[in-house]
Amino acid sequence: MSYVSEQLELLKKKNPGEPEFIQAATEVLTSLEPVIQANPQYEAAGILERIVEPERQIMFRVPWVDDNGKVQVNRGYRVQFNSAIGPYKGGLRLHPSVNLGIIKFLGFEQIFNCLLYT
């Protein structure tokens, strides 16, 4: 089994119920496979393990009062992947349909967005 395949299997085991994140990571790691295979030093340095694991995951409650005066409580999420090149990019998502897998997917994609513009 290749290094990329091993990491994808591990990712699926560690993140069950997060299909959006798994799909994004699978697409990126699969596209990187030729480069990873041609450069064994990346495996030795554990590059893929570090790319797919967030530095921080913050989950918090957001209480608010609706138009009828009733208190509602939503979950908020912030996932931060890599601070190596400076502050984290991203934001907060507070919509009730959002879950941790979606936020991890968005944060994961921001790694590469930041690298392109740095």
Predicted feature residues:
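Structured beta-strand/loop patches that form or line metal/cofactor-binding pockets in enzymes
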Residues: 41-72
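Beta-strand scaffold of nucleotide-dependent catalytic cores
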Residues: 73-77
